Amino acid sequence: MDIRRTVLWMIFSFSLLLLWNNWQIHNGKPSLFGGPAPEAAATQQPKADANGTAASSTASIPSSPAAAPAAASVPGAAAPAAAKSEQVVITTDVLRLTFDSNGAQLIRAELLKYPSSSQSDKPTVLMDRSADLVYVAQTGVVGAPQGESFPTHQTPFHLVSSERSLTGDTLDVVFEAESGGLKVTKTYTLHRGRYDVDVRHAMANTGGAPLSPALYLQLERDGTDPAGTSSFYHTFTGVAVYSEQDKFQKVTFSDIEKKKGTYIKQADNGWIGIVQHYFATAWIPAQGKQRTNELLQVQQNLYAARTIEAVGTIAPGSSANVDAHLWVGPQDQKAMAAVAPGLELVVDYGWLTIIAKPLFTLMTWLHGLLGNWGWTIVALTVIIKAVFFPLAAASYRSMARMKQVAPRLQALKEKYGDDRQKLNQAMMEMYRTEKINPLGGCLPMVVQIPVFIALYWVLLASVEMRGAPWILWVHDLSVRDPFFILPAIMMATMFLQIKLNPTPPDPVQAKVMMIMPLVFGGMMFFFPAGLVLYWCVNNTLSIAQQWTITRNLERQAAAAANR
């Protein structure tokens, strides 16, 4: 059996499989590797009111959890009459947040340090309440006595604080509302240079009877893909739930709609959030308190992810405080890990996380030294080549020796003709005599495939690559090369590598070898420039290494022949 030919066919088939997988995703079908298909944008956006904002729905207000026995189900009560709202714009050094006084809810979030992918002179809009996108953060209190209602995200609040721009290290944005004998003071505390917002709900019982409220923290979003989403490769947009028990769980909007999402319903730890490419939002309640997680479809193409916890009984004249954190920003792993356990897992590297995590850690360290992500990729490639050097050197020696015995292989083919069994036996006998491993020449490529895929996920999922330039025409390593120069270089280096290798005796095998650069190069036209840069540098180093080893073996063979 010709083992080398079998391996080459495996590599070629793997390449075709990757192309077919990307084509499936491009056409909105599920990934062959188990990932969900991209969420198709619904043909109908959530219904809007006269102002163009998303209409309120009593379905978006939860019932209180079972832990509050005196609570009544709010959806059965009449929704409060809409009041004229005030939009409050708050600015820090990294965020511009817009709050609606109706519900004291966050209705727009702009990330000032991250330019928009379509308009570089404007910041990325992560959250908004408009005709194009509905993505908001809401809170409220449920569990009022029958016929009453506590302040929810549909209740008019009034702004108490006056400062709207961060001048010191922190800025408090304070709203108040009173309903059903409960006064709720909602305080958002923003910090300089941070994307996590402290949120405190102070609840005071202003009535004459004990109250048992429950607080809900909620994110609402439509199922539309973020602007700039690639139609060629898939990135996840949907809900994420984390707990110490079940760890990181992802749920697509389509699964929420079909009511078949798998996630933890009861927990006293963790967080709940919404994830998209490079960015995320998440509610992180105080740890150690029992709560209920809910994912539901509010209306057509509008989904809610929320967590509800009982506050406990508040006696007349008494008060209670409930603290939480709200993350609104990039998927910065270091910053997220400092805010909540497991929050950094929103950066999902897939099934090769065990390789991708160390690669990202090494890249971060190298970037601290070099200050440029492009040169960081180059340096990382050199390190990877150094790690694989012993294996690669042995493989290139094997290929060089295969090239030396190529005339003998051709002679064997002519001798045995179509008798494949005798030909293979003669070839294997020659390999044993010459101490050649026919599989050795393929090992470097096979071994590097997991590293290649892991690095692909690192470059695709890490927000640090977004907008990161290299040199000259490469202004963003996270998107494809605008002039396709790197893919062309990659194809050229692959062709050169093939020329350095021994010509396969089988014509079909030789054709497969010549097609492979076109297959891989065609794939790279749509891949991030950073990934193609890695492959180009890797190929260049491989060529230099292979040429050096081959020349040394040729010199040794010539010297032996002259003795």
Curated annotation (Swiss-Prot):
Its main location: membrane. The keyword Lipid metabolism does not apply. The keyword Cell inner membrane applies. CDD domains: 5TM_YidC_Alb3, EcYidC-like_peri. Interacts with the Sec translocase complex via SecD. Specifically interacts with transmembrane segments of nascent integral membrane proteins during membrane integration. This is Membrane protein insertase YidC. It comes from Bordetella parapertussis (strain 12822 / ATCC BAA-587 / NCTC 13253). One of its GO terms (biological process) is protein transport. Residues 36-70 are annotated as: Disordered. Keywords: Cell inner membrane, Cell membrane, Chaperone, Membrane, Protein transport, Transmembrane, Transmembrane helix, Transport. Required for the insertion and/or proper folding and/or complex formation of integral membrane proteins into the membrane. Involved in integration of membrane proteins that insert both dependently and independently of the Sec translocase complex, as well as at least some lipoproteins. Aids folding of multispanning membrane proteins. The chain crosses the membrane at residues 6-26, 373-393, 443-463, 482-502, 512-532.
